[in-house]
Amino acid sequence: MAKSARSKSIRRNKKVLRENVFQPVIDERTKRLSAHLRDQVNDLTKSSSSKEEGIADNSLKEVSSSEVSDNVGMEVDQPKVSTSGPRDNNRNKWAKKHLKKGKRAKNSNFSKFLKKK
């Protein structure tokens, strides 16, 4: 079990990598994201307390209305795809292509499901 993923040496090495290499990267990313969110919250609180409160509210209304209009535009009635029944696989596609050309006739089980003309 020397090269197995369950071997003690492999597990120990992965644990060291997680602790010493990957975890600091995750911690730095978390700090960056929290700082970014903190800045956004501070900006929102400053703008709401300033004279531009009406402008901020109008911009929020515009954004929310544009999101609603985008969502309405996204709701397109598309025909539903049936998830039941046989699927085409590469073998069937190949058989259809080559049987149509008449180059090769295969007598196999899956060819009986092909539509015959």
UniProtKB/Swiss-Prot annotation:
Descriptive protein name: UPF0642 protein C32H8.05
UniProtKB keywords: Nucleus
Source organism per UniProt: Schizosaccharomyces pombe (strain 972 / ATCC 24843)
Pfam families: YBL028C_N (PF10338)
Subcellular location: Nucleus, Nucleolus
Gene Ontology CC: one annotated term: preribosome
Bias (Basic residues): 93-106
UniProt-annotated stretches for the region Disordered: 39-117
GO biological process: assembly of large subunit precursor of preribosome
Taxonomic classification: Eukaryota, Fungi, Dikarya, Ascomycota, Taphrinomycotina
Origin superkingdom: Eukaryota
Low complexity composition bias: residue spans: 107-117
Disulfide pairings: none
Family: Belongs to the UPF0642 family.
